């Protein structure tokens, strides 16, 4: 169905996220990883083995495609945190895993964990989304929900890691347009342990949703009221309790409002 939107993208990034695709490994985090070099792969695998029990690893199956080129090495790992490492960290399991993913993506040159949730996975590449689906042989996966996207980058480069969906743990984001609030959003979110390294504004939106939802416990409705805050004129027309709630969200999280075309 994404083929009907071919002209909405320009071939500089396409991808899919499928939920429910790994029922046999539903209790394990599925790391999908791009590697630019063998050295990066070996170093990243050493880091994974130091912090996680790897129950299965393999190349992600792909087929040769004339319009998908310059592919990195693409591997998949089903993992669970090592009990000793998790206990020593004094972190909740999801926080332990998200910090590991962010650290690898920030510090390990040539390795990028682009999917890290449970019973779900992201498949993306530098190409049109319908070609990406063929490249990853997505007809072999069954999911209860899919998201997909085709990029038309203007201010940011087209590359494998910059394609959508963007993901952290189970959250995936697709986004159209450029956001003028990127730098304000980035400066705020990086105060809480996130690091924006992947050359596109959608990355910061993913981290905002993770921060507000997973860390602060907001509902998706509340998150929407932060990142797409109502106009003040709209807030003023609400009943007193709702007006107070929306005013608090807009004032307390002003730096997380996402604005732009």
Named regions from a protein language model:
Residues 1-261:
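Conserved short alpha-helical segments that host acidic/polar catalytic motifs at enzyme active sites
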């Amino acid at each position: 169905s994404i083929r009907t939107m071919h002209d909405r993208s320009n071939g500089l990034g396409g991808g899919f996220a499928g939920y429910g695709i790994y029922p046999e490994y539903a209790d394990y985090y599925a790391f999908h990883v791009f590697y630019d070099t063998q050295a990066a792969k070996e170093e990243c695998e050493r880091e994974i083995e130091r912090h996680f029990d790897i129950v299965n690893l393999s190349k992600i199956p792909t087929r040769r495609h004339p319009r998908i080129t310059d592919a990195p090495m693409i591997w998949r790992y089903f993992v669970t945190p090592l009990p000793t490492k998790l206990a020593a960290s004094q972190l909740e399991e999801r926080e332990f895993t998200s910090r590991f993913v962010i650290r690898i993506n920030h510090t390990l040159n040539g390795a990028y964990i682009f999917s890290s949730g449970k019973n779900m996975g992201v498949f993306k590449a530098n190409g049109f989304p319908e070609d990406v689906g063929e490249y990853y042989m997505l007809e072999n996966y069954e999911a209860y929900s899919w998201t997909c996207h085709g990029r038309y980058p203007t201010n940011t480069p087209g590359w494998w890691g910059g394609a959508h969906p963007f993901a952290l743990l189970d959250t995936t984001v697709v986004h159209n347009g450029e956001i003028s609030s990127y730098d304000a959003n980035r400066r705020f979110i990086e105060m809480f342990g996130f690091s924006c390294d992947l050359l596109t504004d959608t990355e910061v939106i993913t981290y905002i949703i993770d921060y507000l939802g997973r860390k602060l416990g907001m509902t998706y409705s509340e998150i929407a009221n932060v990142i797409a805050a109502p106009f003040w004129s709209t807030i003023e027309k609400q009943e007193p309790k709702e007006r107070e709630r929306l005013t608090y969200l807009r004032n307390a999280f002003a730096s997380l409002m996402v604005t732009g075309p």
